Amino acid sequence: MAVAADRLQELPARSERVLRHAGIDRLFHWLTAACVLVLMATGLLPHVGVQFDWTGIHWVTGLALVVLVVFHLLRSLVWRRLRAMWFSLAELRTHQVGKYSVAQKLMHHAMTLMVLSAVVTGLLMLKKIRTPLLLRDPYVFSAHTWGVIYVIHGLAALAAITLVIVHVYFGLIPDNRMYLRAMITGWMSRGDQRARVTGIRAGEKHLT
């Protein structure tokens, strides 16, 4: 009981904290993370000798990711949230600080590009397997076109894996733990918020 009381005292009071991520944003983030991890496992493990019936898991999870991506894009367009992810040259020169730093915005854009590339090519690749959704037709594209599709899909997946590793690394280092807490609880203390602004203006890296 004493330990629980101490932990409660460590939590910032409501007046001493700011909302960084709404519940719907946190849910989207963790569902997307789960889909990406499953896709990584089902896509890579068979290539290192771990054999299992991965095809069904892979394409179903891929479709779940498509739903999440479409939801994210529609929500961004309807609520005009896309503007928050763009930056100008003036922002680079003056280190202006909004909700996200330039590094965080660049990470978001890079991950978005890789995920969209993997999603589009993955949807095309559904024509090569048997699913209840599409009639299998592996001859819809030429062998050369299929080769290009597979290369783009593989490179996008490898790039996404690299970005995930970088994202997790920067999320776990002590200076960035406030971002991890905010993605779990939704809140950031005002002290952490001030430290974040000071750190970004000083040129520190925040890639979570």
Annotate each language-model stretch with its function.
Residues 1-208:
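Membrane-embedded alpha-helical bundles that constitute the cytochrome b-like, heme-associated redox core
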